[in-house]
């Protein structure tokens, strides 16, 4: 069992066990209980009443955070038809099949996310088993398979985050950094919860959202009212 650090114990002591906090108070507490020396990420975790084994309850998508993520992502655009648009949108890397081969043959991953135009998807299928486990496979549901590569790159660079329910029905999303003002984190939280409610499967019965927890990198979990 991993040893709990003194800093984490001190942070944990500030959070009342089983208490569910109003959003503003929870965010303030998350900032107070950040245990790292760097600018930690603030994350929200939704525990949903879904069964991801059912096809109609597999939740996946992307949401634009109005206050941004506080993180810069390296974007790879794979295209044969929209090279100029991708370059003008300031994608970090732009190319075609030669980059797919580089991923396949050199285990190259000098990027955070892939945007692809539709004609590239058949070729990308050849490395689906490589990209899939890393969460890098482009998908129309997240807006990463598109002919409008300029918008996709712009959204990602500025403020878009992807989400996907795991096999336990949990969704984890970044809503900013500890250095963000509370108001900015609130903006992002509200955008995220609105999105999660929007994609509620029609077949879900009873309460859809079971609980919501806020945390920072290596910080304690804080339950949030909703």
Swiss-Prot record:
GO terms for cellular component: large ribosomal subunit. GO terms for molecular function: rRNA binding; structural constituent of ribosome; tRNA binding. This is Large ribosomal subunit protein uL1. It comes from Mycoplasma mycoides subsp. mycoides SC (strain CCUG 32753 / NCTC 10114 / PG1). It comes from the Bacteria. GO terms for biological process: regulation of translation; translation. Binds directly to 23S rRNA. The L1 stalk is quite mobile in the ribosome, and is involved in E site tRNA release. Belongs to the universal ribosomal protein uL1 family. InterPro entries: Ribosom_uL1_bac-type (IPR005878), Ribosomal_uL1 (IPR002143), Ribosomal_uL1-like (IPR023674), Ribosomal_uL1/biogenesis (IPR028364), Ribosomal_uL1_3-a/b-sand (IPR016095), Ribosomal_uL1_CS (IPR023673). Part of the 50S ribosomal subunit.
């Amino acid at each position: 069992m991993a040893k709990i650090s003194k800093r984490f114990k001190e942070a944990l002591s500030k959070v009342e066990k089983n208490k569910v906090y109003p959003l503003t108070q929870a965010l303030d507490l998350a900032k107070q209980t950040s245990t790292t020396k760097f600018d930690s990420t603030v994350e929200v975790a939704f525990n949903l009443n879904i069964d991801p084994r059912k096809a109609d309850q597999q939740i996946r998508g992307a949401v634009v955070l109005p206050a941004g993520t506080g993180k810069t992502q390296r974007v790879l655009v794979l295209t044969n038809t929209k090279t100029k648009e991708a370059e003008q949108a300031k994608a970090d890397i732009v190319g075609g099949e030669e980059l797919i081969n580089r991923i396949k043959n050199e285990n190259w991953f000098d990027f955070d996310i892939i945007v692809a135009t539709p004609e590239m998807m058949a070729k990308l299928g050849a490395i689906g088993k490589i990209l899939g486990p890393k969460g890098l496979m482009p998908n129309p549901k997240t807006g990463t398979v598109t002919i409008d590569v300029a918008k996709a790159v712009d959204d990602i660079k500025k403020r878009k985050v992807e989400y996907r329910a795991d096999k336990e029905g949990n969704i984890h999303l970044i809503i900013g950094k500890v250095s963000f003002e509370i108001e900015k984190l609130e903006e992002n939280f509200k955008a995220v919860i609105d999105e999660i409610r929007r994609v509620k499967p029609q077949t879900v019965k009873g309460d859809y959202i079971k609980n919501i927890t806020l945390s920072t990198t290596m910080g304690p979990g804080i339950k949030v009212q909703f």
